[in-house]
């Protein structure tokens, strides 16, 4: 425990140092010695002036005029000519006003301290692969012509959410930056329709889009990702996807640290399909007291396209291991609240197959919540270093109910967040090695598993939630 607290203090100190550094806006009129590797590209660098908002301290917003260099064309020239871009560190950010586009075989290597920052109002991703292809109207075909062998290593990537969640400075979507745009893409680093790609040693800072957004991705590695005051998912994978490794995600994210979404809300995914054979390991929640979602999501479902075609989007053969202080494991569906649950929902609950949770550590309460038809769920090796509340369970099986109040007083605008009327069946569950800190005895399964049966709330909307008629079915 002492070692963990020391690590937390060290992490918090590093993040605080990064935050203080991020509040300093440097005018870019002088050339840095560190940028000499890019000197031949300087004729392509342009200087512009704009307004940015920064936060000197929480809630204290400052408006500053910034004159800085725009490096988009210069970076793109290096990629187009050499397929390798090296970005050295320098005191000021490298601003871009649109995506850096990577063809097959391209590599970006950035110093860990080099910040690549999106100008306010660009509203695009910062870097993407070349052949983005959206599949909003049907399943991904076999001949999608993916980009291959792309690598991104290092750098601080920021879309300048400089103050609060309500102040994204015009950068909210993380779009493709092309015409016509590809629907559903939403990333700071965006790799969709790709094979054999790698993203590692990067920091995602103060951004509204997903940190790393992958879709229709196979044979991928995402490693050593730091989330710094991030406002969306850290690593977000949409189906179809397979044969991936996500390792070493840490920091403070205000949405899921990692999300594997085979089905998803239509305006946040460019494609749908199974996610299989993925390892997620060494994911650490934020230190105690630092606001963060601290969650991992597995979202299966059944997609109904506009022509009525159905596509099963299961999640299978997934291993999550060495996970620390993640408080919510969200293995359930969730209708689209932004576009309306009647306009975008999975057709029934999704399917999970062969899901493994191994070597998990909780210094505070956390739960695995499952509302999906599941065959094969293993939980093995869990350390519980907190006092267990009487009603706490490690695994909850069954539907959830929660009310979202679009208006605090107009109950006609209230809506159910989840799908409390749907049953789910879970079989082949094995729970072992779950122990309190310092104990050599496993906790009994009955203490760890809760099977949920919803009831309609006769007092709704005077009290919430509305409840439902669905239940979890555990086949033992």
Q: Which residue ranges define each predicted feature?
A:
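General secretory precursor processing signal
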Residues: 11, 29-31, 427
């Amino acid at each position: 425990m002492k070692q963990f607290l020391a690590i937390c203090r060290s992490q918090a100190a590093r993040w605080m140092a990064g935050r203080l550094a991020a509040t300093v806006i440097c005018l870019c009129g002088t050339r840095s010695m560190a940028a000499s590797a890019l000197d031949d590209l300087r004729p392509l660098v342009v200087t512009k002036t704009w307004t940015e908002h920064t936060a000197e301290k929480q809630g204290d917003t400052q408006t500053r005029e910034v004159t800085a260099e725009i490096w988009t064309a210069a970076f793109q020239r290096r990629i187009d000519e050499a397929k390798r871009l090296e970005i050295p560190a320098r005191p000021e950010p490298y601003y871009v006003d649109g995506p850096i586009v990577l063809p097959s075989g391209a590599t970006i290597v950035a110093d860990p301290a080099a910040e690549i920052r999106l100008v306010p109002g660009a509203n695009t991703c910062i870097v993407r692969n070349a052949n983005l292809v959206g599949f909003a109207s049907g399943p991904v075909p076999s001949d999608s012509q993916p980009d291959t062998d792309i690598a991104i290593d290092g750098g601080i990537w920021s879309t300048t959410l400089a103050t609060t969640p309500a102040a994204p400075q015009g950068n909210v979507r993380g779009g493709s930056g092309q015409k016509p745009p590809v629907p559903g893409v939403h990333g700071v680093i965006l790799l969709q329709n790709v094979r054999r790609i790698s993203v590692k040693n990067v920091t995602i800072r103060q951004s509204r889009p997903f940190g790393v957004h992958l879709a229709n991705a196979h044979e991928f590695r995402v490693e050593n990702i730091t989330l710094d005051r991030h406002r969306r998912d850290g690593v977000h994978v949409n189906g179809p996807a397979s044969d991936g490794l996500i390792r070493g995600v840490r920091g403070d994210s205000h949405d899921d640290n990692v999300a594997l979404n085979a089905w998803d809300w239509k305006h946040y995914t460019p494609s749908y399909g199974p996610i299989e054979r993925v390892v997620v390991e060494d994911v650490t929640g934020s230190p105690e007291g630092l606001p963060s979602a601290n969650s991992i999501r597995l979202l299966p479902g059944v997609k109904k396209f506009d022509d009525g075609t159905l596509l099963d989007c299961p999640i299978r053969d997934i291993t999550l291991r060495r996970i620390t202080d993640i408080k919510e494991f969200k293995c359930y569906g969730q209708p689209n609240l932004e576009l309306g649950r009647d306009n975008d929902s999975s057709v029934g609950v999704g399917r999970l197959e062969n899901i493994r949770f191994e070597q998990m550590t909780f210094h505070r309460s956390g739960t695995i919540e499952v509302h999906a038809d599941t065959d094969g769920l293993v939980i093995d090796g869990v350390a519980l270093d907190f006092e267990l509340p009487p009603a706490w369970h490690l695994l909850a099986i069954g539907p959830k109910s929660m009310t979202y109040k679009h208006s605090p007083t107009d109950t006609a605008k209230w809506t159910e967040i989840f799908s409390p009327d749907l049953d789910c069946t879970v079989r082949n569950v094995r729970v072992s090695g779950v122990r309190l800190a310092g104990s050599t005895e496993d906790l009994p399964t009955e203490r760890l598993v809760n099977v949920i049966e919803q009831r309609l709330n006769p007092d709704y909307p005077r009290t919430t939630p509305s409840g439902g008629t669905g239940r979890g079915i555990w086949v033992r």
